[in-house]
């Protein structure tokens, strides 16, 4: 008798950046037409590294231009049944959310018009993640990633560079 293992579907990979302040807040983007807020993140393109994809997606979805040297690699995590999420973190100065702009567009099924993927931005305390984000992201940021530790590591790294 053949021992057949169930076929596992290939998981897609999204990459993004958790942009944090030393005041224990993070940047979230409001998803156009939805109630939830999200991180700047998206799919990896052929030939890109996870870091390249995270930087590109963050720039497209917020206008922020970050550098690889400013990133802390948080690794690849199970996100949904069919998707993994590779996250990085970056310590930022407070940017006025009204100055941010999403240039990544999608075609709205109802209107047929192109709309930005993200239509709002804000800085939110870590304890608001569960109320604002979709459950898979809230679970990931609440359990698998210790955002308090991330801020401590990023601040220590900034201080080492300044010394």
Spans of features found by a protein language model:
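Conserved N-terminal beta-strand and adjoining loop/helix that marks the start
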Residues: 1-26, 46
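Short, P/G- and charge-enriched loop/turn segments at secondary-structure junctions
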Residues: 1-8, 74, 107-112
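Catalytic phosphate/metal-binding cores of nucleic-acid and nucleotide-processing enzymes, i.e., regions
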Residues: 7-9, 13, 31, 54, ...
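Short hydrophobic/aromatic beta-strand or adjacent loop that forms the aromatic wall/cage
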Residues: 12-16, 83-87, 118
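Conserved hydrophobic "DFG−1" position in protein kinase catalytic cores
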Residues: 19-20, 28, 90, 123
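Conserved Nudix-box catalytic region and its N-terminal flanking loop in Nudix hydrolases
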Residues: 21-65, 163
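A short coil-to-beta-strand element that immediately follows conserved catalytic motifs
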Residues: 65-75
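Active-site-adjacent beta-strand/loop module that shapes the phosphate/pyrophosphate-binding cleft
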Residues: 77-112, 122-127, 140-151
């Amino acid at each position: 008798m053949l021992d057949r293992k169930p076929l596992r579907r290939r998981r897609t990979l999204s990459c993004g950046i958790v942009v944090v302040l030393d005041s224990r807040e993070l940047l979230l983007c409001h998803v156009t037409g939805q109630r939830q807020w999200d991180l700047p993140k998206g799919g990896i393109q052929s030939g890109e590294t996870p870091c390249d994809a995270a930087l590109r997606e963050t720039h497209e979805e917020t206008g922020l231009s970050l550098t690889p040297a400013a990133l802390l690699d948080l690794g690849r995590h199970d996100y949904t049944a069919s998707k993994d999420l590779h996250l990085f973190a970056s310590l930022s100065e407070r940017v006025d959310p009204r100055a941010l702009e999403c240039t990544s567009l999608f075609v709205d099924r109802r209107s047929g018009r192109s709309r930005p993927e993200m239509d709002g931005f804000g800085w939110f305390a870590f304890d608001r993640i569960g109320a604002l984000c979709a459950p898979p992201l809230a679970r990931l940021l609440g359990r698998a990633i210790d955002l308090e530790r991330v801020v401590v590591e990023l601040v220590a790294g900034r201080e080492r560079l300044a010394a």
